[in-house]
């Protein structure tokens, strides 16, 4: 039998196959491969002595580290302008991860009843990213996102409290995902999604819901000099630098620095580039 892993909890895998869900508690001969099955994987499994065993996992087209999922087309990055306030460094890390894995990132600014900062909106639109404003009070705004991801597998990501579960409640009318109020004491959203789970919206469309988190490591990059390849707006200018190895920091005749001075590159994005660069560099030292 063949199916898609839709949930994994403590070594138990739930596989959806032909409208049935099978609970797989053992890995069988697949255990020898030392490859951990992930939500989104296509698994081949068999029944043996009343249990279902995974025999193999089909080749993945991609794999994310956090959230840890496989075979996705879109990374839906959900943020909100306030409560919790938008974390642009985290957003830029998500974008780097998406670019690295050749996954289309879609930025969703939820709770649009709170006025979005046009600077932030235009900053990402102008470099070619899709940005949607959504609100649970505006069904049409969420419907536009659904139309954009139809026929594909998308993963919801972002900090706690930005409204991912509210979006899921709309997108998947037959499922109920618990939503909690913002914790005013900590001024952080309470995490209500406890595990990664894939939901089928229709026969061709799936959404993977994930727990919220407030940090993201760029462990998939081995060297800090790799980072520049995944900053989208750099691509237009990088071949105009004097040195091919230019890191766009202190090198002479750097086209990126020139474009920064001319305000063709966002100072906010560039500052986040420097922070990510130093973070990767510091980790490599140790």
For each feature predicted by the language model, list its residue ranges.
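Structural detector for short beta-strands of small beta-barrel domains
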Residues: 1-9
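Helix-rich effector regions associated with P-loop NTPase G domains
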Residues: 11, 34-43, 47-50, 59-75, ...
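Beta-strand/loop nucleic-acid-binding surfaces
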Residues: 21-37
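Short, Lys/Arg- and Gly-enriched loop/turn segments at beta-strand edges
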Residues: 49-57, 85-87
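Phosphate-binding glycine-rich loops and their immediate beta-loop-alpha structural context
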Residues: 82-129
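Canonical P-loop GTPase G-domain recognition
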Residues: 111-162
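A conserved segment at the C-terminal end of the G1
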Residues: 164-180
């Amino acid at each position: 039998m063949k199916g898609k892993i839709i949930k994994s909890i403590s070594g138990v895998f739930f596989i959806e196959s032909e409208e049935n869900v099978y609970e797989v508690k053992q890995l069988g001969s697949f255990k020898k491969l030392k490859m951990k099955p992930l939500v989104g994987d296509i698994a081949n499994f068999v029944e043996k002595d009343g249990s279902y065993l995974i025999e193999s996992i089909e080749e993945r087209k991609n794999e994310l580290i956090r959230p840890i999922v496989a075979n996705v087309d879109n990374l839906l990055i959900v943020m909100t302008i306030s409560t919790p306030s938008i974390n642009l460094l985290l957003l830029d890390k998500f974008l780097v991860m998406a670019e690295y894995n050749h996954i289309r990132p879609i930025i969703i600014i939820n709770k649009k009843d709170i006025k979005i900062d046009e600077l932030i909106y235009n900053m990402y639109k102008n470099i070619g990213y899709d940005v949607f404003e959504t609100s649970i009070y505006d069904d049409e705004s969420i419907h536009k996102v659904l139309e954009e991801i139809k026929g594909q597998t998308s993963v919801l990501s972002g900090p706690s409290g930005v409204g991912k579960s509210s979006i899921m409640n709309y997108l998947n009318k037959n499922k109920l995902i618990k939503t909690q109020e913002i914790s005013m004491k900590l001024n952080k959203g309470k995490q209500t999604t406890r595990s990664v789970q894939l939901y089928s919206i229709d026969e061709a469309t799936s959404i993977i819901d994930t727990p919220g988190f407030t940090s993201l490591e760029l462990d998939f990059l081995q060297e800090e000099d790799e980072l520049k390849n995944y900053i989208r707006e750099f691509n237009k200018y990088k071949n105009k630098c004097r040195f091919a190895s230019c890191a766009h920091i202190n090198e002479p005749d750097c086209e990126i620095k020139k474009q920064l001075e001319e305000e063709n590159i966002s100072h906010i994005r560039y500052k986040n580039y420097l922070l990510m660069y130093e973070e990767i560099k510091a980790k490599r030292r140790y």
